[in-house]
Amino acid sequence: MIFSTERQSLIRWSAVVLSLCLNPVLAATESDREPINIQADRAMVSELDGLSVYSGHVVITQGSMKILADEVRLKSENNQLTTILAVGDVAQSGLAGFTRGATRDLESITASASEVEYLVASQQLTLRGQAVLSLGQDRYQGNVLSYDIAKGIFKLESGQDPSDRVNLTINPKADQPL
């Protein structure tokens, strides 16, 4: 049982950490002003260690953004979020998922992998295990996918099996000449 002060601390810590972690990934959108909702079977927060862990059918939403995972770990140092790690097994698919609807300035994003890691300071998104990232109509698929959000650079790696090659589908933009 979580006592009242522990529950308040958990809620406060969760809101601070999630507002720090979600805004850099999503850039400034109208969703940033919407409430952050967290649903999970269990939550553990250690303010001293800068770690919070949500487990069991985790659903995190804010506006058009949604994270689905079996477990989400948030790590911070000096009250600054450093790492977000989402691990799969959502509805037994084995994959963690992230979606964000399109905005006026940004295309929609859908990502899934066995493990999704985001390093906040360097804006590095890494998908490991059956990695798929859709950015608008473009699709990137591989065993490991690294995306430097600030620089717009993708790096994909194939799996061990020769048939497990990287796969990219890039559609021409309507306003770009062929």
Residue ranges and their predicted role:
Residues 1-178:
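Mature-chain termini and adjacent capping regions
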